[in-house]
A protein has these predicted regions:
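N-terminal presequence-like segments and adjacent domain-start helices
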Residues: 1-12
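Amphipathic alpha-helical interaction surfaces in cytosolic regulatory modules
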Residues: 12-38, 43-91
Length: 93
């Protein structure tokens, strides 16, 4: 399954907005997906990604699903945020 992060916007900021995105994703996109299914999180088209938004979305996805791959992470904002999550929240992707 591929999750297109840009569907939630191209400027992704704030913990409340991230929580709302995760709840929508959980209700409509990932609800019936087995935890063993490979998940690809695609950041194509995302201009700004903050650690607070990503911590509400990416971290719980990585905790729930066993096989998560990140796509199109070349953007410097996306890279910096992912590095921050890896450092401070033990993100293992």
């Amino acid at each position: 399954m591929i999750i297109y992060v840009k569907k939630f916007g191209d400027v992704l900021v704030s913990r409340p907005a991230g929580r709302e995105a995760f709840l929508a994703m959980s209700a409509y996109i990932t609800r019936d997906v087995p935890t063993t299914e490979p998940i690809e999180i695609d950041f194509e088209g995302v201009k700004v990604l903050t650690p607070s938004w990503a911590d509400e979305v990416i971290t719980p996805l990585a905790e729930r699903f066993k096989n998560v791959t990140l796509l199109h992470t070349e953007n410097s904002s996306v890279q910096a945020t992912l590095n921050t999550l890896r450092k401070y929240s033990d993100l293992r992707i």
